[in-house]
């Protein structure tokens, strides 16, 4: 271990530019780690591939900190941290399918996009296997993402094919039976969304829709991977699409989030100007039909920080997850994240309802007010809100379900560790709330939850919740929120 540390130190020392850049851009968090900042220690990052670190700087969580860096400077930082050289470019032609794919068609048991249904219940009524089958499952094939060190996009399985995005910005179409590659497509940024497969018109070709971490939406031919259209939906430098696009009646609904809250560590940054949004596009052409912001008023200068820097607001309320379709009421629901500034904002940490036809806002149900938060505030960056909020975003999509008797309910799960039941007929009035986790900046319900016809199921992270952490999974009754069972994480 000592020899390894000496060698690693020697390699770091051999790259003084990388060391200097690291000190200027990275050390404040990674050499002074705290759970609040969600920053891994430098020795943890050193175990990663340099390619992964460059990806984080230019397409991922560190995009704010890397602002203004050249690619060569980013690579120097990655070499300094890891003590490793970059690998030769991976050959994406390896593993190509020998025969062309058959004509694409949907089949029972397919999983298309973020959820099988546009209500975002994430419930497969015809899975093709039972719980008793799970212990007998064996690995048939495995696919390694070329040049990547992590996989973070949910696959879609449609017509015997697997469609999946990657941290390296490539989208792949694989044979579900063998894992061979039919095609790959290179996006401009990392692709974290699920891939949605749809026909914009009856009888037309199937199209694969997705978004990247640079705020661009794409449509490619699902059979060949050929680009049909792409459109950037937000020019803000930290805009990103993490929520999966939803196809509905010829429209593509695309949510927008950002990583601007990570810019707070930079004292000179003019914080903050991003507004979450939802865009409706013509699914055939990519033409924007409407775009509605979750922050209704444009940001304005409202005060100077302690360093004399101009601050702006309101800002925030990004939409991290897929929108939810309410076909009966002709509405689309989104769940929002926190506010970035001290300017009052009643649409953060909320469920919002927009009209599908024109994007007009119908109602707002905010469950956590005054959640003003940006990253690195334990170090008291001059951009920090006066009173730091708990960072209780909604990272999951709202779920719309029909109860026995016909009444409908919206279920939403939050990073606070609370699951909410809302009434869609009463402007999102809270029907019940049940706390299943401690909640924290990395706690509560982070991404996915689901619901069948009677219950809702939510997994709790609570990574940074300390002694109060309650990681695990819980089942609640849809009608009342009553906890039926809870199983702790292993």
Task: Cite the ranges covered by each PLM segment.
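Gly/Gly-Pro-rich "capping" loops immediately C-terminal to redox-active cysteine motifs
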Residues: 19-23, 27-65
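Electrostatic cytochrome c docking/interface patches
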Residues: 8-21, 98-100
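Blade/loop signatures of beta-propeller domains
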Residues: 95-140, 294-299
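C-terminal capping alpha-helices of c-type cytochrome domains
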Residues: 65-91
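Extracytoplasmic/lumenal domain signature
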Residues: 132-146, 171-191, 196-204, 209-239, ...
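Asp/Glu-centered strand-loop micro-motifs enriched in Gly/Pro and often flanked by an aromatic residue
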Residues: 124-132, 136-157, 162-163
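Short, solvent-exposed loop/turn elements at domain surfaces
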Residues: 36-38, 118-124, 147-153, 172, ...
């Amino acid at each position: 271990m000592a020899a390894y540390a000496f060698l690693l130190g020697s390699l770091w020392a051999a790259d003084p530019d990388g060391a200097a850049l690291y000190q200027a851009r990275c050390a404040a968090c990674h050499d002074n780690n705290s759970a609040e900042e969600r920053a891994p220690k430098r020795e943890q990052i050193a175990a990663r591939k340099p390619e992964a670190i460059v990806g984080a700087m230019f397409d991922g969580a560190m995009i704010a900190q890397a602002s203004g860096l050249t690619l060569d400077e980013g690579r120097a930082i990655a070499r300094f941290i890891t003590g490793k050289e970059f690998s030769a470019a991976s050959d994406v032609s390896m593993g190509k399918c020998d025969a062309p794919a058959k004509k694409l068609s949907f089949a029972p048991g397919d999983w298309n996009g973020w959820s099988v249904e546009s209500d975002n219940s994430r419930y497969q009524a015809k899975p093709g296997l039972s719980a008793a089958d799970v212990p007998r499952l064996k690995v048939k094939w495995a696919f390694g993402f070329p040049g990547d060190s992590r996989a973070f996009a949910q696959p879609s399985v449609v017509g015997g094919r697997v469609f999946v995005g990657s941290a390296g910005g490539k989208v792949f179409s694989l044979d579900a039976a063998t894992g061979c590659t039919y095609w790959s497509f290179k996006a401009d940024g990392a692709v974290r969304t699920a891939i949605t497969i749809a026909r914009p018109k009856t009888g037309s070709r199937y199209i694969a829709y997705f978004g990247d971490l640079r705020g661009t939406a794409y449509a490619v031919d699902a059979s060949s991977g050929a680009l049909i259209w792409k459109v950037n939906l937000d020019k803000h430098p930290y805009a990103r699409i993490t929520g999966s696009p939803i196809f509905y009646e010829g429209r593509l609904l695309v949510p927008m989030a950002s990583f601007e809250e990570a810019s707070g560590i930079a004292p000179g940054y003019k914080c903050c100007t991003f507004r979450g949004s939802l865009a409706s596009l013509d699914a055939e052409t990519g033409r924007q039909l409407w775009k509605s912001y979750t922050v209704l008023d444009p940001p304005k200068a409202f005060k100077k920080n302690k360093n004399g820097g101009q601050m702006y607001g309101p800002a925030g309320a990004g939409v991290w997850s897929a929108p939810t379709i309410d076909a009966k009421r002709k509405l689309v629901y989104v769940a929002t994240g926190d506010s970035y500034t001290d300017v009052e904002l009643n649409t953060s940490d909320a469920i919002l309802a927009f009209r599908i036809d024109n994007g007009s806002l119908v109602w707002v149900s905010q469950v956590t007010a005054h959640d003003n938060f940006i990253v690195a505030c334990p170090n008291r960056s001059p951009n920090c809100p006066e009173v730091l909020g708990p960072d209780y975003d909604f990272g999951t999509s709202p779920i719309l379900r029909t109860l026995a008797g016909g009444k409908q309910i919206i279920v939403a799960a939050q990073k606070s560790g609370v699951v909410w039941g809302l009434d869609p007929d009463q402007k999102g009035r809270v029907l019940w709330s049940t706390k299943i986790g401690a909640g924290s900046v990395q706690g509560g319900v982070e991404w996915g939850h689901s619901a069948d016809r009677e219950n809702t199921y939510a997994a709790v992270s609570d990574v940074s919740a300390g002694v109060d952490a309650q990681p695990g999974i819980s089942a609640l009754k849809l009608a009342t929120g009553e906890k039926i069972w809870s199983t702790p994480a292993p």
